[in-house]
């Protein structure tokens, strides 16, 4: 297992998820809730891919495989954790925007 390759997979998928979160928030601000939901689902799928790559690495090490320390992998985990929190926050904002839209209608 090339730990740096896995790290890049995590970073790239999480980063793509972050881009979808930004699109979702832009859609929310424009009261395009269907678009926001679509972007959030896309973000969730990409973050899941990143999470799965991370989990496979952790499980391999737990099973006894020698996994060398990698600062890049640590950065990837930090990136994934941060973007996962952003996704959770964006998912919680969608109903708030919907409530605001219904009160202003």
Predicted feature residues:
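Terminal alpha-helical segments
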Residues: 1-105
